[in-house]
Each structure stands twice: as C-alpha cells, then as structure tokens.
C-alpha cells in the first residue's frame, strides 16, 4: 500500500537524506541534522490507545516532526492531528524538567482525500491570536502586536486530490515530491530508493 511504501522509504534508518529533502521542501527550512526516531506514541492511560505515525524525526536538535500518510478518509483528521500534536508535545516533559526544554512539534498530514474547504493543497495551522475586539483594546504603544500564542505547535495538511488538479511546477521541490508520492506504483518508491 502507499502508506506502507511511504514509511519504508522515508522512515527507514539510512534514508535520512531522502526524508531531509522532503521535509525541507514542506517546511521551507534548512535542516542541518536529522535523526529518525521510533514513531510510536505512548499509550494513553485512559483509553489504552497507542498511536503509530508513519515517520518521526528530530530536526536540528530542537524540533520533532511527525509525518502521517492517510489513504482513507476516516472523517476525523481534524481531531486526530491535534491529538497527536499535543500528546507528542506534552510527553516530552518529564517530572522535574523545565518547560524551556520542550521542543517544537510539527505534524505533517499527507492526505489521499480532500478534507478542508480550502483552495490550497498545502495548508498550515498554528495557534494564532484572534483580532482583538474594539472595546477590549488598551493603548500600550505596541506598533506591531504578537501574532502567535506559541510557535511550538504546527500542523500541515497536504491534500493530494487538490494537488492532482493543478499543473505541477517541476522547478518546485515540494511539487516534485508530490508527483512522486501521487504515483502509487511500487516502481516509483524503488526508483526513489535507487536515486538516493
């Protein structure tokens, strides 16, 4: 299946350069170091559920990135993704540790279905402040206000059916990768392994 092939190629130790290239194209950052980690999210004590994502990596020593390939729409990605995000974030802090030690967490959802009513195939969600109500404003002299409550939590949603509807820009690294991912034949994954 596509998600199995995805995990086999991008989540395999020794394939860090392939994963690095994909993540740089999605996150638009330079990755200096990457470590592929165990993608299992520890069991929740209440419901006993274990979450297993396709790929987990630590980037540049200060960011945890999870990638999940969803082939079928289970009508819950708007609940599932934030649950994984906050669980990974909170599980970092052990008793007695300082909050300053908590790393940024990014969850990337590559969806083989349309989910959100948005006109972009790649949507990024962060915790942003809403616009202040006029009667709640206090003149404190801030010319530019903070936009984010925190930059530590981030979700990406890449909806492949939307991407398939556009002419890909083959000079764009992300669109090159999405063309490969959209081609569900095993030969594509084999080719990717050979190239790298």
Protein language model annotation of sequence segments:
Residues 1-196:
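Elongated, amphipathic alpha-helical interaction scaffolds
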